[in-house]
């Protein structure tokens, strides 16, 4: 059986996202594009995961809670979780304390919107989310595993924010089983 998926989707919460990237728009576009499985992987946060999970459930799409964590070395790593609760706990206990308290400049990066399942704004994250955490690239896999999550280096072959562009190598000794 073939499955069509996208495990690297950002919402209106990510600074690189657009205000149109609401839970319903994400899921409805996924349906229109024939996707069976999606993961929301905003930068260093899971605050819109619960809303997208609910919309995906109603639409019959398999949803995987996720996050795109930026390491201390400025490498992006997708973390995919078994549940919304595990993702939110990982953010609260591991990522949030490791993210510098630098304010988001809304004039440049836009509003980082937290939305409900009806696309209503219920808050905003005032920290600049697309920033390096103090978590090292070789510790992400171990930390994610504590929450039964899988860590996968993101866009590994891109010229920025990837294992190859920053370190020039990818090795299983770094704790990743998937590249």
Model-identified regions with their sequence ranges:
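An N-terminally biased module of ancient metal coordination in phosphate/nucleic-acid-related enzymes
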Residues: 1-73, 167-173
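Extended substrate/RNA-proximal surfaces in nucleic-acid metabolism proteins
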Residues: 2, 54-178
């Amino acid at each position: 059986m073939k499955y069509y998926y996208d495990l690297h989707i950002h919402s209106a919460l990510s600074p690189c996202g657009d205000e149109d990237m609401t839970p319903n728009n994400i899921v409805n576009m996924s349906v229109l594009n024939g996707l069976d499985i999606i993961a929301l992987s905003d930068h260093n946060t899971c605050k819109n995961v619960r809303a997208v999970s609910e919309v995906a459930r109603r639409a019959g799409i398999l949803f995987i809670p996720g996050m795109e964590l930026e390491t201390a070395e400025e490498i992006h790593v997708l973390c995919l979780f078994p549940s919304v609760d595990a993702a939110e706990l990982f953010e609260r206990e591991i990522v949030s304390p490791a993210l510098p308290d630098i304010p988001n400049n809304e004039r440049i990066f836009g509003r980082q919107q937290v939305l409900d399942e009806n696309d209503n704004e219920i808050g905003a994250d005032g920290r600049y989310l697309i920033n390096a955490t103090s978590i090292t690239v070789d510790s992400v896999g171990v930390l994610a595993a504590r929450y039964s999550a899988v860590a996968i280096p993101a866009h590994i072959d891109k010229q920025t924010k990837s294992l190859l562009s920053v370190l020039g190598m990818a090795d299983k000794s770094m704790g990743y089983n998937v590249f």
